[in-house]
């Protein structure tokens, strides 16, 4: 039960996350670098947690600060707006991706970790390792932004460290042991339409368009293999659904090592995120509810899977 006492709320929230005896104290000693007695004085409420300590605990356990200060989801929730800065888009985009990669990669293995995505565009976790497809998403955003001079796709030079962090972003999903993808049935068509438009106004050359087309065929092959196996190369389970209705946006949730993160994709490559528990539960429930409109094509649903990827290759071939 939340009170008007932020310190008491923090203690209660920590005990909800780590209910086993001794587990919470050990975590606090490791995170705050303080002794056992100092930890127990704080847990008894004799000494309040400092703001810096609260922030460290919040990040470690995925406890939202609004919960600590007693705000409810109905009145307020805190979001992190991850918007690429047009003054230095490459560095800004790199920092956003690196933040997620570092956060997930530094966590201990969690066999109960899960991720779910309902997507109307191909998810970043699937396409970012393909350099031209990753470059196209960034190019589209930069061209749309009036503050950035971006004249053609070929002229856009992506820094090597950004290319590498994009691949690391895809690789970090090896830490997620169960993944649900629910795809809009227009997921490839949307991308093809965008590429075709930029090619029609001569911002993408015919030669480059063919190279992008080859990457799309490769991606389709990878996704079909993923659907057939129902698991990644690391052995993590993947369920892929194709929706019979279209989605307005791309939503995702991640639950790993007591970190509950919700993401809403905006402005092509950007997202807003929150660690608010109630928003996480609501978003997860919403994403899972979309399965009732969808067909499972991983492991089972062989005929539907064959038909879906046949259609995607026909769409790609028309580029």
Outline where the language-model segments fall.
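Short secondary-structure junctions and interdomain/linker hinges
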Residues: 17, 21, 104-107, 111, ...
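Hydrophobic protein-protein interaction segments
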Residues: 139-309
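Basic, Lys/Arg-rich alpha-helical nucleic-acid-recognition elements, primarily the DNA-binding modules
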Residues: 1-84
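Helix-turn-helix/homeodomain-like alpha-helical modules used for DNA recognition
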Residues: 74-151
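Exposed alpha-helical structural elements
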Residues: 9, 27, 38, 89-99, ...
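Charged, low-complexity, helix/coiled-coil-prone segments
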Residues: 1-6, 35-40, 126-137, 150-166
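Generic detection of long, well-ordered alpha-helical segments
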Residues: 4, 18, 90, 206-213
């Amino acid at each position: 039960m939340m009170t008007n006492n932020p310190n008491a709320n923090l203690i209660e929230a920590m005990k909800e996350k780590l209910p086993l005896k001794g587990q919470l104290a050990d975590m606090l000693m490791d995170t705050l670098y303080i002794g056992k007695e100092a930890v127990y004085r704080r847990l008894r409420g004799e000494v309040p947690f400092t703001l810096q300590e609260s922030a460290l605990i919040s990040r470690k356990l995925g406890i939202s600060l609004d919960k600590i200060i007693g705000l409810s989801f109905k009145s307020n929730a805190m979001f992190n707006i991850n918007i690429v800065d047009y003054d230095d888009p490459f560095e800004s985009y790199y920092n956003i991706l690196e933040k997620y990669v570092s956060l997930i990669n530094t966590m201990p293995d969690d066999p109960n970790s899960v991720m779910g995505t309902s997507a109307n565009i191909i998810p970043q976790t699937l396409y970012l390792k393909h350099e031209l497809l990753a470059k196209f998403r960034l190019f589209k955003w930069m061209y749309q932004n009036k503050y950035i001079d971006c004249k053609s796709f070929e002229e856009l030079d992506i820094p090597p460290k950004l290319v590498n962090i994009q691949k690391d972003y895809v690789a970090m999903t090896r830490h997620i042991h169960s993944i649900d993808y629910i795809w809009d049935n227009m997921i490839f068509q949307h991308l093809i339409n965008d590429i075709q438009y930029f090619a029609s106004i001569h911002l993408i050359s015919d030669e480059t368009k063919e190279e992008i087309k080859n990457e799309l065929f490769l991606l389709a092959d990878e996704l079909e293999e993923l659907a057939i196996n129902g698991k990644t190369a690391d052995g993590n389970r993947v369920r892929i659904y194709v929706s019979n209705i279209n989605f307005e946006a791309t939503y995702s949730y991640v639950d790993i090592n007591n970190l509950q993160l919700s993401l809403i994709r905006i402005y092509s490559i950007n997202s807003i995120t929150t660690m608010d528990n109630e928003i996480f539960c609501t978003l997860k429930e919403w994403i899972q509810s979309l399965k009732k409109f969808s067909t499972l094509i991983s492991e089972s649903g062989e005929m539907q899977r064959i038909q879906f990827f046949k259609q995607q290759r026909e769409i790609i071939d028309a580029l």
